[in-house]
Each structure stands twice: as structure tokens, then as C-alpha cells.
């Protein structure tokens, strides 16, 4: 099987239960003599990114659990597109941190005001 086929099978298997995964496209493009990297986090990024919802139990007390975070950055007059709002809503639905920030302070507020349980 080609790697792309294996990746698709793995992605499909990960999109069950409390886990969601997306394909992360990594690329490099020469734009007017300047190389631009695409993808998260750029070169070396994993093929699949996602989140897994974990119910914290007493066994987890004192353990560190990473929480997927997505901040959509806009300028003062910038408007969010419906698909961007849908992604923010999706991340929040599955327990992640997400929001729209127009300044560093707004971004920090989104992160610092996160409460894992409603």
C-alpha cells in the first residue's frame, strides 16, 4: 500500500469515538524568490493533527494533559468566515480552546479563561 493510502486508513480510524484527526499538508513554495513554508508547525510537522477528548479521572490528578488550541487572528475590521466559525465551534465542542482574537491580550484571554468543564 502506498503511504498516502495508509495515511487515509489511519485518519479514518482516528475519526471515531472521542478522537478527530485532519490531514496536515506541508509544503514549501517559492514566491518571488522567497520560500514560504505551509503546514503546522512547518517542516517536520506530522501528517495528521487532531484532538482527543479525555475525561479526567482521579488517576489523572497531577498529570499534564495537552489541550488543542486554535486562535483565529483578525484585525480590527476583519470578519470571520462561516467555515472559520464552524471550526472554532467544532474545537470547543470537543473540549479544545478556540476563539477569535484581534490582539495578543484577546488571545491570552481566550486561553486563560478556558474551563475544561462547563
Task: Give each language-model segment a name.
Residues 1-118:
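Catalytic phosphate/metal-binding cores of nucleic-acid and nucleotide-processing enzymes, i.e., regions
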Amino acid at each position: 500500500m502506498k503511504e498516502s493510502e495508509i495515511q487515509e486508513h489511519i485518519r479514518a480510524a482516528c475519526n471515531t469515538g472521542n478522537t478527530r484527526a485532519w490531514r496536515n499538508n506541508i509544503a514549501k513554495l517559492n514566491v518571488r524568490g522567497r520560500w514560504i513554508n505551509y503546514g503546522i508547525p512547518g517542516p517536520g510537522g506530522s501528517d495528521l493533527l487532531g484532538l482527543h477528548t479525555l475525561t479526567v479521572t482521579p488517576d489523572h490528578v497531577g498529570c499534564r494533559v495537552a489541550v488543542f488550541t486554535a486562535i483565529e487572528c483578525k484585525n480590527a475590521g476583519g470578519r470571520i468566515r462561516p467555515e472559520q466559525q464552524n471550526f472554532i465551534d467544532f474545537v470547543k465542542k470537543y473540549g479544545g480552546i478556540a476563539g477569535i482574537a484581534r490582539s495578543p491580550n484577546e488571545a491570552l484571554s481566550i486561553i486563560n479563561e478556558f474551563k475544561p468543564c462547563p
